């Protein structure tokens, strides 16, 4: 906790008035149920998906049960590469904060799994359909766990 105070003017009776500022930072952890391995992976710098123990289908976003045969799934690490299927430049902040506009959002088909993700792409240029991207983990503490990573266009200069 950090407390700051500065003298400001005076009240109507001539007494000094102080502005007191209090900043409190709290860190907490909570379980996110069967998706916990995904968030633990983010802390470790890897994207995780699930694979069906019955038919072998792979899923991202991760699923506890396979959509094909309802068998339980196992967790595994993705290579962190994919292909842009659509992209746009966004000029308003996201509802959860943590990103200053403008920023780029892209639908990305991840390599090796069914499904994909709509997520932020780092860089000044909006990627074209078919552009190859690689996951990049952000060094600073994110405002939301899903902001712990973004994608970079392969071969692009930052």
Question: Which residue stretches match the model-derived regions?
Answer:
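Short microdomains enriched in Cys/His and/or Lys/Arg
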Residues: 30-36, 72-100
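Proline-rich low-complexity regions
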Residues: 61-62, 102, 147
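Residue-level recognition of beta-strand microenvironments
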Residues: 58, 81, 87, 124, ...
């Amino acid at each position: 906790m950090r407390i700051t105070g500065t003298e400001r003017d005076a009240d109507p009776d001539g007494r000094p008035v102080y502005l007191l500022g209090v900043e409190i930072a709290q860190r907490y952890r909570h379980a996110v149920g069967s998706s916990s391995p995904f968030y633990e992976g983010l802390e470790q710098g890897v994207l995780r998906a699930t694979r069906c123990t019955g038919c072998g289908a792979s899923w991202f976003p991760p699923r506890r049960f396979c959509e094909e045969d309802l068998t339980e799934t196992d967790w595994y690490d993705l290579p962190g590469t994919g292909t842009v299927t659509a992209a746009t430049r966004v000029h308003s902040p996201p509802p959860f904060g943590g990103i200053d506009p403008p920023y780029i959002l892209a639908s990305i088909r991840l390599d090796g799994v069914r499904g994909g993700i709509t997520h932020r792409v780092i860089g000044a240029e909006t990627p074209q359909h078919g552009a190859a991207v690689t996951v990049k983990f952000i060094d600073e503490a994110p405002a939301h766990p899903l902001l712990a990573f973004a994608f970079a266009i392969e071969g692009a200069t930052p």
